[in-house]
Amino acid sequence: SGAAAVLLFLLTMALLGGLTAAAGLWSHSRLEELPALADSTWQPLPVREELPEETTVERAPTGDGTTLTISPLPSGGAHSLQEIYRENIASIVSIRGSKGDGMSLGTGVVMSEDGYIITNSHVIEGCGAVDVVLQDERVFQALLVGQDAQSDLAVLKIDCAGLTPAQFGDSTLLEVGDAVAAIGNPLGEELRGTMTDGIISAINRDVNVDGYTMVLLQTTAALNSGNSGGALINDRGQVVGITNLKMRAYDNTVEGLGFAIP
């Protein structure tokens, strides 16, 4: 019971001249830094104690926006993991945010055929410019449509048509025990398009982050730094959450405690 735990935003940071993975840490019980990882090229960021950094990414023209369409649950049985991957991988993108002397690296999900992308707000927090990398390795500079730190969501726009949008499902239909899969870019672009699977282990989980409460889905699907902004997908191939947090203990191993925004 004396174990201190922290919530990690699933964000990878790359310093120019050398790759370094890190995550912003939000203490669940006391503010501390995690010990350095065994590999000296990897290190954590310090605990966040200040207000969110201002994002200075160029904004899309006023009035630009899109509507997120929630599709009904398809008829028929559950899809195989192979089917879920094939149905969704084209909709998963990499997010590169220029930030001071480095970059933040995360994941995004295509919302529309004409270039709208959803990701986590903390992925682009403090960035001066953001690029989106598609699965075919094309790179587009993104404009910021909107961002909300408390919900930890942001919408970007790239000048590209013909994208493959994900199908979004109704997260209120989820039940504890439902099978889910997560697709994202753990530890950055070298491992982009990684899929893990698990179950929904809790619904409407209240998680205190930086003094306010987020109501999240809890999952056993493995999530790591770089998965921020990625897709949590139900067994019918629909995106039902945007992955953003995991829990980690200081003095014992915690596994299978990942979170997603419903």
State what each model feature region is.
Residues 1-41:
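Gram-positive cell-envelope targeting signals
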Residues 24-107, 121, 129, 175:
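N-terminal activation segment of mature serine protease catalytic domains
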Residues 24-37, 112-152, 158-162:
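Catalytic-histidine neighborhood of serine endopeptidases
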Residues 23, 99-103, 127-130, 163, ...:
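Active-site loop architecture of trypsin-fold serine endopeptidases
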Residues 96, 109-111, 124, 143-146, ...:
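Conserved positions in beta-strands of structured domains
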Residues 90-95, 108, 115-119, 142, ...:
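Terminal peptide-recognition signature
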Residues 83-84, 143-145, 162-189, 261:
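Active-site substrate-binding loop(s) of clan PA
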Residues 75-83, 96-116, 131, 138-141, ...:
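A conserved glycine-rich beta-strand in the N-terminal activation segment of trypsin-fold
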